């Protein structure tokens, strides 16, 4: 990408999209195109086609998505599948129709099989059954990355995909039922501290292992890959480090300053037992994350405190 290239960031108000915009601006890119949902509904094909025909972006970061935690994924299966699939197809297809030089599709590590060998390599995609608790979202994301791959094979496009591990950081979603585990814990422990609660009950038994990547580090990788990688196979984005949900919970409580008891409701689902990405491909390309987990949680908590409205989204 040149510094004056026309770059469209889809989903710029979300955690990932806003981080990509910040990173592009930090690196001196000066022709960044964004649209709010009100200005451009990505699920409406006619609007997307008109936007691409008029704006002709040269590069596209597709970070728009309908996302949520276990509760949302289990109660809105059809919504998650439909909205994600239609917006992905609309953007990717319109980019191809209008001669976009390169597109980067942002997926999720939930695309990998529930019992995939750990750490999960990019090549383990579609080798066995998906995790049922987020199957609808995973299938939609797989469709998006496969469509990019097939366009490359059939039409010679240069469309790449990135599969991040669990993300957190500025502009996260702290909704009580529609957020992911780390922001949900930040909100719960903050509210428990403010209320003087003696105990907090968390789902599951705390044994699942998870990996977390600070979103600004992901954004740095996304720009790096747009400039340095071409290929059909996706690229994993993570730290290569994992932590148990129990230890994560204790770390969040420490950062927030909650000193009460932490209990576990074992009647609730754990989700996937272990999710650690093999990040050797990104490493071999010359990239490495910068933000360690405790520091990232501190920065996230500061962001949460700076804008109380985040908790209401």
Mark where each language-model region is.
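Conserved beta-loop-beta element that borders a ligand/cofactor-binding pocket
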Residues: 107-108, 145-173, 183-186, 194-202
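SDR active-site strand-loop-helix element
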Residues: 10, 35, 60-66, 103-109, ...
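Conserved Rossmann-fold NAD(P)-dependent oxidoreductase catalytic core, especially the SDR/UDP-sugar
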Residues: 89-134
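Active-site helix of classical SDR
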Residues: 136, 140-143
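C-terminal substrate-binding subdomain of Rossmann-fold SDR/epimerase-dehydratase oxidoreductases
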Residues: 10-15, 19-27, 191-313
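NAD(P)H-binding glycine-rich loop region in Rossmannoid oxidoreductase-like domains
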Residues: 45-85, 94-97
């Amino acid at each position: 990408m040149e510094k004056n290239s026309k770059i469209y960031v889809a989903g710029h108000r979300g955690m990932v999209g806003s981080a990509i915009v910040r990173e592009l601006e930090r690196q001196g890119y000066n022709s960044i195109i964004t649209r709010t949902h009100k200005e451009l509904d990505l699920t409406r094909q006619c609007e997307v086609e008109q936007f691409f025909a008029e704006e002709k972006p040269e590069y596209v970061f597709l970070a728009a998505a309908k996302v949520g935690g276990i509760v949302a994924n289990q109660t809105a299966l059809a919504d998650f599948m439909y909205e994600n699939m239609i917006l992905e197809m609309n953007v990717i297809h319109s980019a191809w129709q209008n001669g976009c030089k390169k597109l980067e599709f942002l997926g999720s590590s939930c695309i990998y099989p529930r019992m995939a060998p750990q750490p999960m390599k990019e090549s383990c995609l579609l080798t066995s059954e998906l995790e049922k608790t987020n199957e609808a979202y995973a299938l939609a994301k797989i469709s998006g990355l496969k469509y990019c791959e097939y366009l490359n094979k059939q039409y010679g496009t240069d469309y790449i995909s990135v599969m991040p591990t669990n993300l957190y950081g500025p502009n996260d979603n702290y909704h009580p039922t529609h957020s992911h585990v780390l922001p949900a814990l930040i909100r719960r422990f903050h509210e428990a501290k403010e209320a003087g609660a003696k105990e907090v009950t968390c789902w599951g038994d705390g044994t699942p292992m998870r990996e977390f990547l600070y979103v600004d580090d992901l954004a740095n990788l996304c720009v790096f890959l747009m400039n340095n990688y071409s290929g059909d196979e996706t690229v994993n984005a993570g730290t290569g480090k994992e932590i148990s949900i129990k230890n994560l919970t204790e770390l969040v409580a420490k950062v927030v300053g909650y000193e009460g008891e932490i209990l576990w409701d074992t009647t609730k689902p754990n989700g996937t037992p272990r999710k650690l990405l093999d990040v050797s491909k990104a490493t071999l390309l010359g990239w490495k994350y910068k933000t360690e987990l405790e520091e990232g949680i501190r920065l996230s908590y500061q962001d949460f405190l700076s804008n109380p409205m985040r908790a209401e989204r």
